[in-house]
Amino acid sequence: MPLTDSLRDDILAAVPSLRAFAISLSGNADRADDLVQETLLRALANIDSFQPGSNLPAWLFTILRNLFRSDYRKRRREVEDADGSYAKTLKSQPGQTAHLEFEEFRAALDKLPQDQREALILVGASGFSYEDAAAICGCAVGTIKSRVNRARSKLSALLYVDGAEDFGPDDTVRAVIGGNG
């Protein structure tokens, strides 16, 4: 399939969501940017394998996820400030409560198993349907639903959130934890 203007525009429209997903996976904006760039290069190099009429964002997210997993396996042996002592010296004190709440949310999200975090980010934050998230992750729809449910339950417990409380500083956090946005 040739790269049409419409297809190019659709790919470019997916970049912000790809970057957000890459950041949620890697926890590092620079690595996320590298993942997105490599995803776009791979997608363009393999544009002939994209099936017209199928879900372009799901195809792109699948490429990104596979790249992340490959990169993760390579980096698993690297030690990069494992205890965070160096990073703590670089941090400045946040000036707003929302920033503190988001950091607390981010820390809780990082405690989730990788498969649950991926499912939750895809469904809760990126707005993919359970079916699309299952296609991206290469598993059954029921598996995605289970992962999302377990992730939401664990996040709620980690953040001491019950059904009556406000779910966080913004709509994305509320959608991820509460399932509505």
Swiss-Prot record:
GO terms for molecular function: DNA binding; sigma factor activity. One of its GO terms (biological process) is DNA-templated transcription initiation. PROSITE patterns: SIGMA70_ECF. Pfam families: Sigma70_r2 (PF04542), Sigma70_r4_2 (PF08281). Residues 15-77 are annotated as: Sigma-70 factor domain-2. It comes from the Bacteria. Residues 103-155 are annotated as: Sigma-70 factor domain-4. Keywords: DNA-binding, Sigma factor, Stress response, Transcription, Transcription regulation. The keyword Transcription applies. Belongs to the sigma-70 factor family. ECF subfamily. Sigma factors are initiation factors that promote the attachment of RNA polymerase to specific initiation sites and are then released. Regulates expression of hpnP under a variety of stresses, including high temperature, pH stress, and presence of nonionic osmolytes. The sigma-70 factor domain-2 mediates sequence-specific interaction with the -10 element in promoter DNA, and plays an important role in melting the double-stranded DNA and the formation of the transcription bubble. The sigma-70 factor domain-2 mediates interaction with the RNA polymerase subunits RpoB and RpoC. This is ECF RNA polymerase sigma factor EcfG. It comes from Rhodopseudomonas palustris (strain TIE-1).
